[in-house]
Regions:
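Amphipathic terminal alpha-helices
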Residues: 163, 171-184
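C-terminal accessory subdomains/tails of enzymes that are appended
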Residues: 117, 166-167
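Catalytic nucleophile serine of serine hydrolases
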Residues: 4-5, 171
């Protein structure tokens, strides 16, 4: 089993090329395999929520791009399901959350849970990267995260498929639950 990236062959995310190459190598190897093309993890954004609370703003560069993220647990359950059922193996799955959201909607969800307004502030990609670097992230990581947000604005992290919830036999974890866990 290989965990890849949602819509890897068509993705403009900087990390797509290595996933596409790995998928090609697996196909050429003749070894039986299953590919789980995971969408974004909701925790990718949830881990920044304590800082958003501290600074009274959630910042990003995703504009109003829809993000079809799912919780890490959802992806883990899908992998376990496929590993335990030979009938599900040998395929490629495009996995994403049932509930898409914008970063403004994430900020609104956070605001509702803490009882105070935490706005989403959208900024240009370079400014967002600079803000992340200023907060202590290494420049390469800050640039990568800003690039991912900018690509989200173009729809790269959006998907309407429900293969993930079909595999796990339930709806994917709601955004509100991941937010609650992050601010615990």
């Amino acid at each position: 089993m290989y965990t890849s990236l949602l819509k890897a062959p068509h993705s403009t995310l900087g990390l797509a090329a290595e996933h596409v190459e790995t998928e090609k190598l697996l196909a050429a190897s003749g070894i039986g395999h299953t590919v789980l093309r995971n969408g974004w993890y909701t925790e990718n954004y949830a881990m920044g929520l304590p800082a958003a609370l501290e600074h009274n703003a959630l910042i990003g560069a995703a504009k109003d791009g829809q993000i079809s993220a799912a919780a890490r647990q959802d992806y883990a359950e899908a992998a376990a399901t496929v590993l335990l059922d030979a009938g599900l193996q040998g395929k490629t799955y495009e996995l994403s959350g049932d509930e898409s959201f914008t970063l403004a909607e994430l900020a609104a969800t956070l605001s509702a849970q803490v009882g105070k307004e935490v706005p989403y502030i959208d900024m240009p990609e370079a400014d967002y990267a600079a803000a992340l670097s200023g907060a202590g992230l290494p420049a390469d990581l800050a640039g990568f995260l800003a690039h991912c947000d900018a690509e989200a604005a173009k729809g790269v992290l959006f998907d309407e498929d429900t293969q993930l919830s079909a595999l796990i036999g339930r709806p994917t974890t709601p955004l509100s639950k991941v937010v609650a866990a992050a601010i615990g």
